[in-house]
UniProtKB/Swiss-Prot annotation:
Protein name, UniProt field: Nuclear autoantigenic sperm protein
Ranges of compositional bias, category Low complexity: 342-353, 667-681
Region (Histone-binding): 117-128, 211-244, 458-501
Span(s) of short sequence motif Nuclear localization signal: 705-711
Domain of life: Eukaryota
Keyword Repeat tagged: yes
Length: 777
């Protein structure tokens, strides 16, 4: 039983102890809140300490961030107006003020946040990687030189090998070109021989056609026709050089030798297009060129047969006449019209030469085509076939062979009329006259070419103008777009600036909030913090150039500090100094000098106290000495400020006096007593001059009258009489002219006193009165 009782007693004791432990244990929610509160307070204190450290070290942005975070933490926990937030807001505003000074100051650190030391360290590492010439020995230098020379020698050897490889390749190319040239010469020679054979077989056909054309009308004609061909390599020098002979050159040569009755024909065709295009013939006689192209069968105006001339292309691109067809011309009375159209000129020129000898032999020099000519004798005309590359030349009485080249103009149509052809003497004459056209074909061609060129130029100019206008429009559009974009950007920037609050404004808000929080507390520490808040608010006002507000804030700070601080405290000296600066900025130099002098007094008191404490102290006086040295360094700066304030006061007084003088002169001009005396003196000086020159005035008037009345002779006499009368009146009483008004007054007084004494005095006064009246008028 005893064991059971002891067991139950033990169980009950355990239960009671468990209940007590549960009662003593706090609730889980309240414990978590306490832990969080402790964490926030400790974190805020850490941030405040870190911010003060950054502020002392000069890292202003880091200090601002630390104080901002601390203020936000405390504000979330206690509320923005809680007493616990006052210190965080104060230091946050102070750091913002320093940041604003750094941004606005000219001597601010522009490289803030840039890791200059790290960059320098990187540079040193890079430089260490590069070898320095000073550290290299002579042996190393020699090795480097040998390596450089070896490398350069290898480069030169490679260059020479490249050149040696290039030379044989060039030689091979030249040899292949020479072989190709020889083959081309051989190829060119073969068609030339064939041309000779074919052209030599042509005289029989030529004679037959000429005989049929002549009939009985031409007793004498061409007996023989010798056609000789030259090789293409014996071409005219101008054709070999690729030069083209213009129509003006042909006309000049024809005009020089027109008296000999030579007709020159020159044709230029593409060798490859000879079979496709019809032959083109240019006839010239006595300086009149004619271009003929047999595009279609020629309508001769009668019932004569119509025949076509066809050209074929040789194996080497050379056209040779296969069919020679004669055409009969109508009688001399009829004038058929031949429509000629020039074919397109190509790069290959073929100058043809045909000469008629006096003996009646025709010598034809073919090059690339067939000649189709025209010759007449007697009353009828006979046709002679020619190759495309030749022209027929009709001569008189054994004229010499002439060589002329002409370049055909593409797409040219001319109408020619063949007039009467007559045969006279032993020779053969061919006369071809142009139709009665207003302008020659060459002129027409030139005019057409000029018109085409002008049209092209105008089109080009119009195109350029349109392009230029389009470009200008595009540029204007771009400029407008850029302006609109810039305007939008400026607006957005202005809006952002308006939205963003400056550091000074934010500092003012934080310090004002801290001042309110500290002022409602009665403790000395809180009041001193409030005084410091007033001081920093004054500095913000100075930065924003609101000097009156700054003076008010500094004065409030001074009042609070004087209540709770000793007379030798350095905070008082600082407040006096800041107040003196504010007065100086506000042009209140007397008050500025007074505040600066009070600051010096406080510093001197502090130095005296430190000296006493240093004497009393038994230990090392190093701390006191350091503070004394700091205070001594501050004194010269404050004294310099005093001198500046006094000097500016003097200059300001002088400027004020000058300004007042100018204002007084401008406001009282003409109304001051000096102005009145000057006006009186002017009046007095005018009176005697008027009195003295009264006679002169009369003479001037008489002079004017004399000019207007020239025929009157009495006017000068009357003027002289008036002068004689007036002069004794002016000079009689006093003997001299009156110079001033004061003399007139004195004479009047003297004459008034002497009236009763003598008649002479009375007469003098009368004369003086007369003079005064004369001067007054």
């Amino acid at each position: 039983m005893a064991a059971e009782s002891t067991a139950t007693a033990a169980i009950t004791a355990e239960l009671v102890s468990a209940d007590k432990i549960e009662e003593d244990a706090p609730a889980p929610s309240t414990s978590a809140d306490k832990v969080e509160s402790l964490d926030v307070d400790s974190e805020a204190k850490k941030l405040l300490g870190l911010g003060q450290k950054h502020l002392v070290m000069g890292d202003i942005p880091a200090a601002v961030n630390a104080f901002q975070e601390a203020a936000s933490l405390l504000g979330k926990k206690y509320g923005e107006t809680a007493n616990e937030c006052g210190e965080a807001f104060f230091f946050y505003g102070k750091s913002l003020l320093e940041l604003a000074r750094m941004e606005n100051g000219v001597l601010g650190n522009a490289l803030e946040g840039v890791h200059v030391e790290e960059e320098e360290g990187e540079k040193t590492e890079e430089e260490s990687l590069v070898e320095n010439n000073d550290n290299i020995d002579e042996e190393a230098r020699e090795e480097l030189r040998e390596q450089v020379y070896d490398a350069m020698g290898e480069k030169e050897a490679q260059k020479t090998e490249d050149k040696s490889l290039v030379k044989p390749e060039m030689d091979k190319e030249q040899e292949t070109e020479m072989e190709k040239g020889g083959r081309e010469d051989m190829d060119i020679g073969e068609p030339a021989e064939e041309l000779q054979e074919k052209v030599k077989s042509a005289p029989d056909q030529l004679t037959e056609t000429t005989e049929e054309g002549k009939g009985a009308a031409a007793p004498e004609g061409l007996s023989e026709a010798e056609v000789t061909s030259k090789k293409p390599d014996q071409e005219i020098p101008g054709a070999e050089e690729g030069k083209s002979v213009s129509e003006t050159d042909v006309q000049e040569e024809c005009r020089e030798k027109g008296g000999q009755g030579e007709v020159i024909v020159s044709i230029e065709e593409k060798p490859k297009e000879a079979s496709k295009e019809q032959p083109v013939v240019t006839l010239e006689k006595q300086g009149t060129p004619v271009e003929i192209e047999a595009v279609k069968p020629v309508d001769m105006g009668g019932d004569e047969p119509k025949e076509q001339v066809a050209a074929s292309e040789s194996e080497r691109g050379k056209a040779i006449l296969e069919q020679l067809v004669g055409q009969e011309l109508p009688s001399a009375e009829e004038s058929p019209e031949v429509t000629t159209q020039a074919a397109d000129a190509s790069a290959a020129e073929a100058g043809s030469e045909v000469s008629e000898k006096p003996g009646g032999q025709d010598t034809v020099l073919p090059q690339d085509g067939a000649v189709n000519g025209l010759s007449a004798a007697g009353d009828h005309a006979s046709t002679k076939p020619q190759t495309n590359a030749e022209g027929l030349i009709g001569t008189k009485d054994g004229s010499a062979l002439e060589k002329v080249r002409a370049e055909l103009v593409p797409s040219q149509e001319t109408k020619l009329s063949v007039e009467e052809s007559e045969a006279a003497g032993d020779g053969v004459e061919t006369e071809v006259a142009q139709g009665a056209t207003e302008q020659s074909p060459e002129d027409k061609v030139k005019i057409a070419a000029n018109e085409e060129a002008q049209d092209k130029e105008e089109q080009m100019k119009e195109g350029e103008e349109t392009e230029g206008s389009e470009e200008e429009d595009k540029e204007n559009d771009k400029a407008e777009e850029t302006l609109n974009d810039s305007a939008l950007e400026n607006k957005s920037l202005q809006e952002n600036e308006e939205e963003e609050i400056g550091n000074l404004e934010l500092a003012w808000d934080m310090l004002d909030l801290a001042k309110i929080i500290f002022k409602r507390q009665d403790t000395k520490e809180a009041q001193l913090y409030a005084a410091q808040a007033h001081l920093k608010l004054g500095e913000v006002s100075v930065e924003s150039e609101n000097y009156l507000q700054a003076v008010e804030e500094f004065q409030a700070c001074l009042n609070l500090q004087e209540q709770y601080l000793e007379a030798h405290d350095r905070l008082l000296a600082e407040t006096h100094y800041q107040l003196g600066l504010a007065y100086g900025y506000n042009s209140q130099y007397d008050e500025a000098v007074a505040q600066f002098s009070k600051s010096i007094e406080v510093i001197e008191k502090r130095m005296a106290v430190l000296n006493e404490q240093m004497k009393e102290a038994e230990g090392s006086p190093t701390e006191y000495e350091k503070e004394i040295e700091e205070l001594k360094e501050l004194l010269p700066e404050i004294r310099e400020k005093i001198e500046d304030a006094k000097e500016s006061q003097r200059s300001g007084n002088v400027a004020e006096l000058a300004l007042k003088a100018t204002l007084v002169e401008s406001s009282t001009s003409g109304f001051t007593p000096s102005g009145g005396s000057s006006s009186v003196s002017m009046i007095a000086s005018r009176k005697p001059t008027d009195g003295a020159s009264s006679s002169n005035c009369v003479t001037d008037i008489s002079h004017l009258v004399r000019k207007k009345r020239k025929p009157e002779e009495e006017s000068p006499r009357k003027d002289d009489a008036k002068k004689a009368k007036q002069e004794p009146e002016v000079n009689g009483g006093s003997g001299d002219t009156i110079s001033t008004g004061t003399e007139v007054a004195e004479n009047m007084e003297e004459e008034a006193e002497n009236k009763a004494e003598s008649r002479a005095a009375v007469e003098g006064t009368v004369e003086a009165g007369a003079t005064v009246e004369s001067t007054a008028c």
